[in-house]
Regions:
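Interfacial segments of alpha-helical transmembrane regions
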Residues: 3-15, 79-94
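Hydrophobic transmembrane helix segments
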Residues: 16-55
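Core segments of transmembrane alpha-helices
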Residues: 18, 53-62, 128-132
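Juxtamembrane helix-break-helix junctions at the cytosolic face
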Residues: 60-91
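Membrane-helix boundary connector in multi-pass membrane proteins
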Residues: 103-123, 140-143
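Non-cytosolic membrane-interface motifs at loop->transmembrane helix junctions
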Residues: 39-46, 89-90, 113-127
Length: 143
């Protein structure tokens, strides 16, 4: 197990984010999305992201576990990650996914007015800032 407190904080952020993703989608699918002012096709646009976000959540949890357990890379993993610990490589993969999804949300919310207060703009702003911030934290930590 890692004795580095920064590693544990990063791993905790990864797991909390993964749990946040799960809670978001559970709540999202329990909401009708018929509020006035939502852009045309909102539900059809958003629904497929459950798949990418689920993959992201799994990568975040696996990365966190591997980061704190200090598991040395197996020979097959060395081919993929060089000699970098696999948890760090997965952290960078998660960072790329977070960056992509955060920029996509930023562009979509800005284009469709979903940053306005009446359209849960505060929550949407928090999602984008949190997503992009964690991406930068992971990149700075593991590059």
């Amino acid at each position: 197990m890692s004795d580095n407190p920064v590693t544990w904080v990063i791993a905790a952020l990864e797991v909390i984010t993964a749990l946040g993703i799960a809670v978001y989608w559970i709540m999202w699918f329990r909401t009708p999305h018929d509020e006035p002012g939502l852009p045309d096709g909102y539900a059809d646009h958003e629904a497929p992201f459950v798949f990418t976000d689920t993959i992201l959540a799994v990568v975040l949890v696996v990365a966190a576990v591997l980061q704190v357990t200090d598991v040395p890379p197996a020979s097959a993993a060395r081919l993929v990650s060089g000699n970098r610990p696999v948890g760090e490589s997965l952290g960078l993969i998660a960072a790329g996914m977070l960056l992509f999804l955060g920029i996509l949300d930023l562009a979509y919310f800005a284009r469709t007015g979903l940053f306005k207060r009446e359209h849960e703009g505060i929550i949407n702003t928090g999602v984008v800032i949190g997503t992009l911030t964690l991406a930068v934290v992971l990149i700075v930590r593991f590059v």
